[in-house]
């Protein structure tokens, strides 16, 4: 039998650079395995309001 999907959770990534500059914040949703990745995710994603790739950190 297949195991349940209770280890994978939906998280939100929010742009940090736009937040500092007071511009429109871009957000992405993705999933992560909370057993393998216990700390907060930090990914480089595209921010359409700034028109460049910026750091996006996991928020609650």
From Swiss-Prot:
Gene3D superfamilies: Ribosomal protein L33. Transmembrane segments: none annotated. Pfam families: Ribosomal_L33 (PF00471). GO terms for molecular function: structural constituent of ribosome. HAMAP family: Ribosomal_bL33 (MF_00294). PANTHER family: 50S RIBOSOMAL PROTEIN L33, CHLOROPLASTIC, LARGE RIBOSOMAL SUBUNIT PROTEIN BL33C. This is Large ribosomal subunit protein bL33. It comes from Chlorobium phaeovibrioides (strain DSM 265 / 1930) (Prosthecochloris vibrioformis (strain DSM 265)).
């Amino acid at each position: 039998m297949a195991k349940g999907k209770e280890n994978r959770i939906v998280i939100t990534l929010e742009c940090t650079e736009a937040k500092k500059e007071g511009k429109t914040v871009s957000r992405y949703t993705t999933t992560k395995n909370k057993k393998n990745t216990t700390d907060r995710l930090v990914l480089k994603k595209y921010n359409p309001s700034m028109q460049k790739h910026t750091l996006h950190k996991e928020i609650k």
